[in-house]
Amino acid sequence: MSQFDNVSVIKQANVYFGGKCISHTVQFPDGSRKTLGVILPSTLHFETGAPEVMEIVAGGCRVQLAGQTGWQSYQAGDSFSIPGNSGFQIEVSDTLHYVCHFG
């Protein structure tokens, strides 16, 4: 799916890590939400409250989930799941475009 229809977008950006990760929240009619964003080249650590699925739209990254020693590589078209109350490290060498699905 290349677009979301019939949604509301929060105008204020979510800016993390000094601007290395920037996203916008999209709200759906059923009350669910997603964020659409970019991560600039960096290695970052994110914490999760609710379970998340990260969908890679463009670019690539390496990810290490909390409690794991190995890294997994992901490219455009891939996705990975993060449990709630957990975290992950993400390493990006070129700008990464993503959709974060919550719940």
Swiss-Prot record:
Protein family membership: Belongs to the nucleoside phosphorylase PpnP family.
Organism: Methylococcus capsulatus (strain ATCC 33009 / NCIMB 11132 / Bath)
Database matches in HAMAP family: Nucleos_phosphorylase_PpnP
Annotated Gene Ontology cellular component terms: cytosol
Keyword match DNA repair: no
Top-level taxon of the source organism: Bacteria
Keywords on record: Glycosyltransferase, Transferase
Name the UniProt record assigns to this protein: Pyrimidine/purine nucleoside phosphorylase
Enzyme Commission numbers on file: 2.4.2.1, 2.4.2.2
Function: Catalyzes the phosphorolysis of diverse nucleosides, yielding D-ribose 1-phosphate and the respective free bases. Can use uridine, adenosine, guanosine, cytidine, thymidine, inosine and xanthosine as substrates. Also catalyzes the reverse reactions.
Record flagged with keyword Transferase: yes
Alphabetized GO MF terms: guanosine phosphorylase activity; purine-nucleoside phosphorylase activity; thymidine phosphorylase activity; uridine phosphorylase activity
Reaction equation(s) it catalyzes: a purine D-ribonucleoside + phosphate = a purine nucleobase + alpha-D-ribose 1-phosphate; adenosine + phosphate = alpha-D-ribose 1-phosphate + adenine; cytidine + phosphate = cytosine + alpha-D-ribose 1-phosphate; guanosine + phosphate = alpha-D-ribose 1-phosphate + guanine
InterPro entries, A to Z: Ppnp, RmlC-like_jellyroll, RmlC_Cupin_sf
